[in-house]
């Protein structure tokens, strides 16, 4: 089981909930990854997931960004249920990004090239894309 650690940034006064996973269950075939997992994240908090390989850390992040849909449960971002929304909606509307630990989406590209390729899918204006990267 993954251990969820939250740290609060000092002097950050807002406490708006920005992320909530509510009773998330994930199964790969008959294998239970986790069941009824719930947690929230407020503005000013940093989330860390700890645990050995295979306990569901990457699965949790894939659910948050929309690459994977849970078998049961809901994902809320800014109090909006986004469980059925694709990754492109979440990244564009909620400014969520994800950099995988093993070299990015396209293994032959640099980090900058990966960011550029992904940004082309969600930011139409080329000048704005170049500024952001």
Predicted regions and their residues:
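Conserved structural motif at the start of ABC-family nucleotide-binding domains
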Residues: 19-21, 34-36
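The feature captures the beta-strand-to-loop junction immediately N-terminal to the Walker
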Residues: 50-52
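Conserved Walker
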Residues: 58-59
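Helix-to-loop junction immediately C-terminal to a conserved catalytic motif
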Residues: 65
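ATP-binding/catalytic-site motifs of ATP-hydrolyzing domains
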Residues: 74-76, 80
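ABC ATPase NBD coupling module
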Residues: 81-97, 102
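Q-loop/switch helix immediately C-terminal to the Walker
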Residues: 102, 108-121
């Amino acid at each position: 089981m993954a251990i969820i650690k939250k740290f609060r940034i000092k002097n950050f006064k807002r406490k708006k909930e920005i992320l909530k996973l509510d009773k998330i269950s994930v199964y790969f075939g008959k294998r239970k990854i986790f069941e009824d997992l719930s947690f929230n994240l407020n503005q000013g908090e940093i989330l860390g997931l700890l645990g050995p390989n295979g306990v569901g850390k990457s699965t949790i992040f894939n659910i948050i960004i929309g690459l994977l849909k849970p078998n049961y449960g809901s994902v809320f971002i800014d109090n909006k249920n986004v469980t059925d929304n694709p990754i492109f909606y979440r990244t564009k509307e909620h400014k969520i990004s994800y950099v995988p630990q093993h070299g990015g989406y396209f293994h032959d590209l640099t980090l900058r090239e990966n960011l550029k390729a992904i940004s082309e899918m969600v930011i139409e204006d080329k000048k704005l894309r170049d500024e952001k990267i």
